[in-house]
Curated annotation (Swiss-Prot):
Pfam families: Ribosomal_S10. Belongs to the universal ribosomal protein uS10 family. It comes from the Bacteria. SMART domains: Ribosomal_S10. Keywords: Ribonucleoprotein, Ribosomal protein. One of its GO terms (biological process) is translation. Part of the 30S ribosomal subunit. The gene is rpsJ. This is Small ribosomal subunit protein uS10. It comes from Synechococcus sp. (strain WH7803). Involved in the binding of tRNA to the ribosomes. GO terms for molecular function: structural constituent of ribosome; tRNA binding. SUPFAM superfamilies: Ribosomal protein S10. GO terms for cellular component: ribonucleoprotein complex; ribosome. HAMAP family: Ribosomal_uS10.
Length: 106
């Protein structure tokens, strides 16, 4: 039964438009996992998604004049192995920026 508990894993997926804010959040999560004696692997960078929007510059004619805007979504994965109850409580109380989307799987 103890081997089943040792094989437990928490997978945290993080998404953000700002890469620096995402890296700071990853550092906070890894630091929290290390202080509670859990093993953290990551952050593993995933491919960045680029979404490009094409907009007409003029409100009337001039279809040849266009402007491009893009959003980049940076993504990371962190795996936490053998989490304890303290680890889960510490991760729940962790204060992360609002610009970072967090998805947790047990």
């Amino acid at each position: 039964m103890s081997t089943a508990i040792a094989q437990q894993k928490i997978r945290i997926r993080l998404k953000a438009f700002d890469r620096r804010m995402l890296d700071l959040s990853c550092d906070k999560i890894i630091e929290t996992a290390d202080t509670t004696a859990a093993t953290a692997i990551g952050p593993i960078p995933l491919p960045t998604k680029r979404k490009i929007y094409c907009v007409l510059r003029s409100p009337h004619v001039d279809k040849d004049s266009r402007e491009h805007f893009e959003t980049r979504t940076h993504r990371r994965i962190i795996d936490i192995y053998s989490p304890s109850a303290k680890t889960i409580d510490a991760l729940m109380k962790l204060d992360l920026p609002s610009g970072v989307d967090i998805e947790v799987k047990l």
